[in-house]
Amino acid sequence: MNILLIIGSLHPGIGNNANLISKLIPFLAAEHSVRVLSFTGKTDRAKLPEAFCGAPVRWCVDDRTDLKRRFTYPAIGKLIDRHGASDALQRRLLRDEAAGFRREYPFDAVISTIQPFPCADTAAHLPGVRRLLYLMDPPAVICGRVSTSYRDRSLGKVLAAQDRIVTTPFIADALLSSEIPISREKLIVVGFPMVDKPIPPTRRQDDGRIRLLFCGWLYSDIRSPKYFLDILSRLDERFTVTFMGRECEKLTERFDVRTKAELITIPQQPYETALQAMADSDIMINIGNSVPVHMPSKTLEYINTGKPFVNFYKMDDCPTLYYTKRYPLCLNLSEKDPDIGAAAERFIEFCVSNKGKTVDRAYIEREYADCTPGYIANKILEALSM
């Protein structure tokens, strides 16, 4: 079977959806041909990677994908986005590129991601192929860039065109209870493909410090660190707290951070560097989202390490709890708890008593089997072969 992956966010950095797909490619390519179609704004073609996780990449390059940046006034660019004009240009470019690519590579099946949206829309309009949508972001996330009416109208058409949709249990429930007509039989419910062989930690002598790590993207709205920062203000000199990821280097500019702990802020790093930082930390920090059914995939990356971590959740039905309540070395702290002092005491006691502990690997692989790349890839291949 010839499989085409239509994914964005491969250049200049790899986005979350592309990172998730990267876990599956080795399993998809074990017995099948896999190629990638992706797009980027105006750039030097010589700098574009020729392959992604071993799969050859066909690039769609055009500066029109950055239409809104041509305007002096940001408000005009935002208005263009809200009515889908930027998406429309990207769709046109991708559709033309896919049609031309098909003459060179006669693909039988197409797997696309929902973000960026033109990837899924392009796949939905390719005739005579099996179509599978990899839907790991809830529809509400798209609403941040476009109007609700445009999102619902476009999303309904894209979902209807798919043969199967791979998604999380939370998004599946949200879709089935929404006004978008979709059958349960079309859905393949899995976790994030993050339970894989973990990176071993760097060997070092124990100096008595407790190293905490937040790794990920800091948002001021949907993933605000404010509650954790309130606890951070109560930590002493034993702790080293590292924030690593997008926007983390601006932490002290955006928030009032006061602590006796050693504080380190690091901008977004290559994925392998982030994984090594997780392996070398003592306790990790997970901050849940305020958007319903939107779960940080980092939650399962933390679980995969086998190390202790603290999960801050903003909603009683936060999807992180589905996984963290089963994890023996996780402290779940609700951000609705007004008693910061008591929460800080629980936090400190958890860190001190669990430093150096790990969860049995066999337990993780058994309890989170639906989050392994091999399991998910097999589900996808079964669906594409029907």
Which positions does each model-derived feature cover?
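N-terminal subdomain of nucleotide-sugar transferases
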Residues: M1-C60, S233-D236
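Membrane-proximal helix-turn-helix segments that form the acceptor-binding/catalytic region
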Residues: L24, P118, T148-T167
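A short, active-site helix/loop in glycosyltransferases that binds the activated sugar's phosphate group
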Residues: A160-L187
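An aromatic- and histidine-rich active-site surface loop
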Residues: D44, D87-R95, V110-G128
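Nucleotide-sugar donor phosphate/pyrophosphate-binding loop at the beta->alpha transition
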Residues: P139-V158, D196, D221-I222
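Conserved donor-binding/catalytic core segment of Leloir-type glycosyltransferases
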Residues: L4, Q205-I222, L229
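Catalytic binding pocket for nucleotide-activated donors in carbohydrate/polymer assembly enzymes
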Residues: A279-D370
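Nucleotide-activated donor-binding/catalytic signature segment of Leloir-type glycosyltransferases, i.e.
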Residues: G245, L251-T273
